Curated annotation (Swiss-Prot):
This protein's name: Phosphoglycolate phosphatase
The family this protein is said to belong to: Belongs to the HAD-like hydrolase superfamily. CbbY/CbbZ/Gph/YieH family.
Gene name linked to the record: gph
Residues at the catalytic site: D12
Organism: Vibrio parahaemolyticus serotype O3:K6 (strain RIMD 2210633)
Coiled coil: none
Keywords: Carbohydrate metabolism, Hydrolase, Magnesium, Metal-binding
Protein's GO biological process: carbohydrate metabolic process; DNA repair; glycolate biosynthetic process
Cross-referenced NCBIfam families: HAD-SF-IA-v1 (TIGR01549), HAD-SF-IA-v3 (TIGR01509), HAD-SF-IIIA (TIGR01662), PGP_bact (TIGR01449), PRK13222.1-2 (NF009695)
Classification lineage: Bacteria, Pseudomonadati, Pseudomonadota, Gammaproteobacteria, Vibrionales
Cross-referenced Pfam families: HAD_2 (PF13419)
Amino acid sequence: MTQQDIKLIAFDLDGTLLDSVPDLAVAADQAVQALGYPAVSEEQVRDYVGNGADVLIGRALSQSMTISSDLSEDLRAKGRELFDDFYAQSGHQLSHLYPTVKETLEELHQAGFTMALVTNKPSKFVPEILEQHGIAKYFVDVLGGDAFPEKKPNPVALNWLMEKHQVKASEMLMVGDSKNDILAAKNAGCASFGLTYGYNHGEPISASNPDFVADSLSELLEVVAVSA
């Protein structure tokens, strides 16, 4: 099955193109411990990511996917501030691209597709990370989690892209690893390509019913009918 009319492809970042949890986990652990809360592990943080940094810190402080109502707004705000500082200081040295990512982006670029990045990650961290991993040149638009009032699964970023590039929903594809990515696509009326690796709170991506499910980003080339 292919989507031969696709013109615009929107990609998630964390868990889709980049395994960033090792750096996120270190920063989250440093932040919660600085506030006198118990340490969090990389394994825990793999479940906590996907809904933006504020939610990540709330979950880390709560040691749970459900954020404790006992946490004050001031405490969560301080935790977020500390997290941002520690994450910025990390230099993102532990993060790495998943296999086939750079090669796939290059082939899509050569084939003439318009590509955008739509992530719930805070915008200020994204350009440096894309440059560091040599993939910034592939994206005409980079939309962080604070680019609009609402994050994925709200479709506002995808709707904005369609309007900017004058494409119909049938001409756009959302590529991601989490329920939020697939729901954002459904809410925007466009097709979705779900990756089985990445971060989806322990739930198989197939449970969100994406239009396509793949174990590797390279399978996207076949979906959009790029000849190898």
